[in-house]
Amino acid sequence: MERRTQRERRETTERALLTATADLVVESGLGSVTLAEVGRRAGYSRGIVTHHFGSKQALVEALVSASQAGFVPGLDEMDPGLGRFLALVERYLGAVGGIGSLSRAFLVLWAESVASAELGPVFRERDALFRADIAADLEAGRAAGDVRADVEPAIVAAIVVAELRGLALQYLVAPDSIDPGAAGRALRAHWQAALGA
């Protein structure tokens, strides 16, 4: 059997710790997350959690970052513009139907961030980046002549983030109430008609 490198062992440990954190968040919210419980859940000591992340805040920030990485596959290979925007809208909701504990934890934490001094700044920054990415796609689409000149990218971006996150939360709360794939297709068709030049 081939020995794993230090880096591979570290990545395996971090993945296990993030998964344990996500599971706790999904089950009971942020209040249930302690470094000791994360370590126990992952099969490690509290000390290893502290060693890897330093604090609960850093652990939660790492969870938020990891949960968003690659959530909507294939977008990085696309050029900015209307096509990328429409793919995001459809694929984001399509991905919701198959999300794992990391992404579920992201949505739970996003909802909790409204009343949390710990989470508020993290999610304000994340949402600002998400809106900026969407607005950049719309601006590129406008420059290419694919998006109407009177469209306000920042306003549309705020609406779209609310739609995507709101529909995802609805699915998380009541999975039988919404078909995420169908919702994604409907939202794509709506925005294609609303934005088209």
Please describe what each predicted stretch is.
Residues 53, 108-115:
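Short helix-capping/turn signature of helix-turn-helix
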Residues 65-70:
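Short, basic, alpha-helical segments at the C-terminal edge of helix-turn-helix-like DNA-binding modules
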Residues 62, 73-104, 153-160, 184:
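Hydrophobic alpha-helical connector segments
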